[in-house]
Regions:
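Conserved GNAT acetyl-CoA-binding A-motif
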Residues: 194-206
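Active/binding-pocket-proximal capping segment
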Residues: 173, 184-186, 208
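Conserved acetyl-CoA-binding loop-helix of GNAT-fold acetyltransferases
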Residues: 178-192
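Conserved catalytic-core subdomain
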Residues: 142, 206-208
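A conserved beta-strand-loop-helix scaffold within acyl/acetyltransferase catalytic domains
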Residues: 1-179
Length: 208
């Protein structure tokens, strides 16, 4: 991906419609990222092994990742984890739930005074369907908290910063929770970082 002389906004517009939607999706779900240190490379190693088994390729070893840090130096290697912040996700969904509940009450009150209003009846049906879906999401979040605690690891990637480019070298993802678009959170973070730090090229070399 050529970044030279381009802004983040210009790069975002160049993405396909589906990629832009995937980025908006992870933002909607409160997916976050954080940089891992060398002592946390076991997270990448574990997720990469799971990905390799699923996609039938040979994963690199934990020693390989550590050797990269020693060979290139810590300033040239960045390992990033994306994760679903379940508390933040729950707060956002609860806010949507409360708002939708109020909207439904307002629409019902309007229809009591103005029965037969087709537009409002359609709106009520849509809001009630959304209300039910939010109820299910909130219940599901509680189930996820019981299983995972406060966060769910979604993807983990290792990048090499060298010369005029950032190279996406190793990528892994949580297939079970792919709906949250964890890999896109990492890629968009690193593309923006590459622009901020003046790199000309973002190299999608890695395996995901």
């Amino acid at each position: 991906l050529n970044l030279k002389g381009k802004t983040k906004e210009e790069i975002f517009k160049e993405f396909s419609y589906q990629t832009r939607q995937d980025i908006r999706t992870y933002e909607k779900y409160c997916v976050k990222t954080r940089v891992l240190n060398e002592d946390q490379l076991d997270i990448l190693d574990e997720m990469e092994k799971e990905t390799s088994e699923r996609q039938d390729f040979e994963a690199m070893s934990l020693d390989f990742y550590k050797d990269l840090y020693h060979f290139y130096g810590k300033s040239h290697i960045e390992t990033v984890l994306s994760y679903l912040d379940l508390d933040a996700y729950a707060i956002k969904m609860q806010s949507e739930f409360d708002k939708t509940s109020k909207d439904i009450e307002k629409t019902k009150a309007f229809l009591e005074q103005n029965p037969g209003n087709v537009k409002k009846e359609k709106r009520l049906k849509t809001d009630e369907e959304y209300y039910n879906s939010l109820q299910k999401k909130l219940s599901h979040i509680e189930e996820l908290k019981q299983e995972y605690g406060k966060e769910i690891p979604l993807a983990c990637c290792l990048f090499v910063k060298y010369g005029h480019q950032i190279v996406y070298l190793v990528g892994s993802s949580n297939y079970e929770h792919r709906v949250f678009r964890g890999p896109y959170a990492i890629q968009w973070k690193m593309i923006q970082e590459a622009i901020d730090e003046g790199y000309d090229l973002y190299n999608f070399y890695g395996i995901s």
